[in-house]
């Protein structure tokens, strides 16, 4: 049976989200149709507002309403360390542990030759520019995920940053290989920051 066009379009829209396959998209589409009209309107407004009002910080690449973001503007934070993460959601995970009080830099991805992602496709050039322009930064903590791509990205950044005389460390791997920072519990992240290793 073929679905009416509005349902088919809704299913297709949900399938564009990462990790959402056909069955889940269909379930979400029918759930959306069954929702109260006001809730659907509010949901749609939230999507539009998020896309319209949020952008990336011109300094660190984090998601923000203001530019620069609240973290970059906060002079009480440790200005000598920059923690490099893959995605903005990793900043949120690190902030939850309340252990790290430095600055961040969001790469928006990792090096992945298989996926055709090279250094020019992620936020590395702006990190290097930031380090050149800010002599207060003494340490770069690399917090990419413990995946082959995350490790390759960490090594690449380390090779670029070390010649500038900036200390480069890597989060300790209380994080298991293949795990994502956003899914780690607070104690694991705390231990990973505490036990970071020099590269």
Curated annotation (Swiss-Prot):
The terms under GO molecular function for this entry are:
DNA binding; zinc ion binding
Family from the record: Belongs to the RecR family.
Task: Kindly list the organism's lineage.
Answer: Bacteria, Bacillati, Bacillota, Bacilli, Lactobacillales
The processes (GO biological process) annotated in the record are: DNA recombination; DNA repair
Q: Which residues form the Toprim domain?
A: 80-176
Record's protein name: Recombination protein RecR
Sorted alphabetically, which InterPro entries does this protein's record hold? Answer: DNA_Rcmb_RecR, Rcmb_RecR, Rcmb_RecR_Znf, TOPRIM_dom, TOPRIM_RecR
Intrachain S-S bonds: none
Residue intervals of every C4-type zinc finger in the record: 57-72
Q: Is Cell wall biogenesis/degradation a UniProt keyword of this protein? A: no
In its UniProt entry, the species of origin is given as Lactiplantibacillus plantarum (strain ATCC BAA-793 / NCIMB 8826 / WCFS1) (Lactobacillus plantarum)
Q: Which PROSITE patterns does the record cross-reference, listed alphabetically? A: RECR, TOPRIM
- Which purpose does this protein serve, as stated in its record? May play a role in DNA repair. It seems to be involved in an RecBC-independent recombinational process of DNA repair. It may act with RecF and RecO.
Q: Which UniProt keywords apply?
A: DNA damage, DNA recombination, DNA repair, Metal-binding, Zinc, Zinc-finger
Q: Which domain of life is it from?
A: Bacteria
Keyword DNA repair among UniProt keywords: yes
């Amino acid at each position: 049976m073929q679905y009416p066009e509005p349902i088919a379009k809704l299913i297709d829209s949900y399938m564009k989200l990462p990790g959402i396959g056909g069955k889940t998209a269909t379930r979400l589409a029918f759930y959306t149709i069954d929702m109260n009209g006001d809730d659907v309107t509010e949901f749609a407004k939230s999507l539009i507002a998020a896309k319209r009002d949020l952008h990336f910080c011109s300094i660190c690449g984090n998601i923000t309403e203001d530019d620069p973001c609240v973290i970059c503007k906060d002079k009480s934070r440790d200005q000598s360390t920059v923690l490099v993460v893959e995605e903005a959601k990793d900043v949120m995970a690190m902030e939850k542990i309340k252990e790290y009080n430095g600055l961040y830099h969001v790469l928006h991805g990792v090096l992945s030759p298989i996926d055709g992602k090279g250094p020019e496709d992620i936020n590395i050039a702006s990190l290097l520019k930031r380090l050149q322009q800010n002599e207060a930064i003494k340490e770069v903590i690399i917090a990419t995920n413990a995946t082959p791509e995350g490790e390759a990205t960490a090594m690449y950044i380390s090779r670029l940053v070390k010649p500038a005389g900036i200390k480069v460390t890597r989060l300790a791997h209380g994080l298991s290989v293949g795990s994502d920072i956003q899914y780690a519990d607070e104690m694991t992240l705390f231990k990973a920051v505490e036990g970071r290793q020099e590269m």
